[in-house]
């Protein structure tokens, strides 16, 4: 067993024995990657959330709070592209039938490769050309072609289950903020720039969850969407990068365990001007994303305005012009 695995096992055992975290529904054999926070775990988690809300809402002169619904109108997720394209690259081992994420297999064996910039076809070709990429279960290099696996949990609202009653558990907390932009701006009378923050649960049907509580199908996000005038976005992007990093350091995280990784142009979404991940040196991997900061321009608000037919423009009284804010 590698030292990183020993370290993680020690953390898991400590959390179980001290009442921080228990396996979910343990008396029935548990549920894979489901965890319940015990008495100390609840206090610990609440302290982190309170510290975040204090720093990002109460102490910030720019931000306000929100608690949006977990189940939203399904058109929300059609508009954002989640229904059609929120997916992981799934493949099967032909030898043992185990299922894996293709990007994870490539990244584990070839960390020097930028998997995030690869298409599904490019991943297929890369795996076929590298026989050192084998199934972690049986050790064979024999995989099916990659296919898309949608990560959203589907459910139904009402007494009948048909296409008209289909809804989804939200896979992220950001969209609840975007669809409420006009409501918040109107009722608070805020002028740009301002942000909206919320803490809430999100759900993703991950193919290969794992590593204790660090990758689960049910999790909480601490989200801030900051709205600003176009042309000032990169300045605010730099501001919030520093703000987020400084808050993490204020919690007692050692600086050498954090790093900021700017996304390469090939990694960026077509609507993004810049993205930076704050990565942490987890005990089970070299580095992993802890926090993502992105300049999303006006993409989200523009999409929702177009699909809903409702104006999400902001009137700037200083310049006497209407525009859709950048985020």
At which residue positions do the language-model features occur?
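TRNA-recognition modules of translation machinery and tRNA-sensing kinases, especially anticodon-binding
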Residues: 2-327
């Amino acid at each position: 067993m590698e030292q990183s695995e020993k370290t993680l096992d020690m953390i898991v055992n400590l959390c179980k024995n001290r009442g921080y975290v228990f396996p979910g529904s343990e008396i029935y054999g548990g549920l894979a990657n489901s965890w319940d926070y015990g008495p100390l775990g609840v206090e610990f988690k609440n302290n982190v959330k309170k510290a975040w809300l204090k720093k990002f809402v109460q102490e910030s002169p720019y931000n306000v709070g929100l608690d949006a619904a977990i189940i939203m109108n399904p058109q929300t997720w059609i508009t954002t592209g989640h229904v059609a394209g929120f997916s992981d690259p799934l493949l099967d081992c032909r030898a043992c039938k185990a299922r894996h994420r293709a990007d994870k297999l490539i990244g584990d064996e070839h960390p020097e490769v930028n998997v995030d910039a690869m298409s599904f076809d490019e991943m297929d070709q890369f795996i076929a050309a590298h026989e050192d990429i084998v199934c972690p279960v049986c050790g064979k290099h024999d995989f099916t072609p990659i296919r898309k696996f949608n990560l959203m949990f589907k459910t139904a609202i009402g007494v009948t289950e048909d296409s008209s009653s289909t809804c989804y558990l939200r896979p992220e907390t950001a969209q609840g903020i975007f669809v409420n932009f006009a409501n918040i701006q109107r009722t608070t009378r805020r002028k740009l720039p301002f942000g909206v923050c919320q803490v809430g649960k999100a759900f993703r049907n991950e193919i290969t969850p794992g590593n204790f509580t660090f990758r689960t199908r049910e999790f909480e996000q601490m989200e801030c969407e900051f709205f600003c005038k176009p042309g000032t976005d990169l300045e605010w992007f730099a501001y919030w990068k520093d703000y987020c990093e400084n808050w993490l350091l204020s919690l007692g995280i050692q600086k050498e365990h954090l790093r900021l990784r700017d996304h390469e142009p090939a990694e960026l979404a077509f609507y993004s001007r810049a993205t930076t991940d704050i990565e942490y040196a987890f005990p089970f991997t070299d580095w992993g994303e802890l926090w993502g900061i992105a300049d999303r321009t006006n993409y989200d608000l523009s999409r929702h305005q177009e699909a809903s037919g409702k104006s999400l423009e902001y009137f700037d009284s200083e310049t006497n012009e209407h525009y859709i804010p950048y985020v």
